[in-house]
A protein has these predicted regions:
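Rossmann-like dinucleotide/phosphate-binding beta-alpha-beta segment
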Residues: 21, 132-224
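Phosphate-binding beta-alpha-beta segment of Rossmann-like dinucleotide-binding domains, i.e.
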Residues: 87-89, 94-143, 158, 162, ...
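An N-terminal-biased, well-structured beta-alpha scaffold segment characteristic
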Residues: 1-92, 195, 215-217, 221
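Short, Asp-centered acidic motifs that coordinate Mg2+ and/or phosphate
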Residues: 45-46, 68, 199, 227, ...
């Protein structure tokens, strides 16, 4: 496999090791700029990114030798897939890597809201012991609506079932029957799910059909005691509509790991007391990054060998 690989973002060292063991020449430049990529992309058969680097049509047009663009992660919205397809470039991702990490983060975010953990921590640091004000709720017996029942959605369903939550599911494709029986899934359309659930978690890609799928009208369907979690992609929820719902008390809480504009350090949602934010860290565990790197290395090798 005497071919060259450009790794543009910080990834687990195992990726470079595995590729080099298989005879590939690897250039690791985790801080490379778009301008630098434009200058050198024409020299590589494989380009690897994570979240930071955007592989645009302009870059792809310069990628004359490129056979593969690989993302060490799940979502592919930082790669122009249409441009890649036009040049017969394979686009790979590592959905397997993030399954457990993202599902566990959702559980953490639900517990953070249910027990007001971020607020409790802040108040103690500020010298306030507000035990009596922090009357939480339990997850046991609550209804969790899962929008999108792929690998991550199903993993979340199993974890939530172990906490004795009731699972409502919606997906545009057929839902796995075995999984449905395992967790006692109640299938519903989106509107029914939104109006019934105490917590709603999103696990869908960002497409034209999912952009702002949660807008002001959809939020009005939800109970005032309900809480929303998004670890999928920022554009799935209309953040202005979400801000108004939280501010006006029409929704009890929200937790977002992903935002329409990232970094989201100046986002006005972060001024609200009933909002929890994390910095797009769903797949940011040692285990997930190691697994994703191994998965991508294996896929790259298989494609170059003509096996995949």
């Amino acid at each position: 496999l005497n071919q060259s690989v450009l790794i543009c973002d910080q990834v687990s060292p195992i990726l470079k090791e595995v590729l080099e063991k298989n005879g590939l020449k690897v250039t690791y430049e985790p801080e490379v700029t778009p301008e630098q990529i434009a200058e050198k992309i024409g020299n590589f058969e494989v380009v690897v990114v994570r979240s930071r680097t955007k592989i645009t049509r302009e870059l792809i047009e310069k990628a004359d030798k490129c056979k593969i663009i690989a993302r060490v992660g799940v979502g592919l919205d930082n790669i122009d897939q249409n441009a890649a397809k036009e040049k017969n470039i394979r686009v790979l991702n590592a959905v397997e890597g993030a399954i457990t990490a993202v599902a566990e983060l959702v559980i953490g975010l639900m517990l953070s809201m249910a027990r007001e953990i971020p607020r409790a921590d802040r108040e103690i640091r500020n010298g306030n012991w507000i035990k009596k004000e922090l009357m939480g709720t339990e997850l046991k017996g609550k209804y969790l609506g899962i929008v999108g029942l792929g690998n991550i959605g199903k993993r979340l369903g199993r974890l939530a079932r172990a906490l004795n939550m009731n699972i409502i599911g919606y997906d545009v494709t057929e839902i796995d029957e075995e999984f449905s029986k395992e967790v006692g899934l109640m299938k519903a359309d989106l509107d029914t799910l939104l109006s019934s659930a105490d917590y709603v978690s999103f696990h869908v890609p960002l497409l034209d059909s999912t952009r702002h799928m949660i807008n002001a009208d959809k939020l009005k369907l939800m109970k005032k005691t309900a809480r929303i979690i998004n670890t999928a992609r920022g554009g799935v929820i209309d953040e202005d509509a979400l801000y108004n719902s939280l501010k006006d008390g029409n929704l009890a809480g929200a937790a977002l790991d992903v935002f329409e504009v990232e970094p989201a350090t100046g986002n006005r949602l972060t001024t609200l007391p009933n909002f929890v934010a994390t910095p797009h860290m769903g797949a940011q565990t040692k285990e997930a990054q190691l697994l994703a790197a191994n998965v991508i290395a294996e896929k790259i090798i298989q494609v170059l060998r003509g096996v995949l």
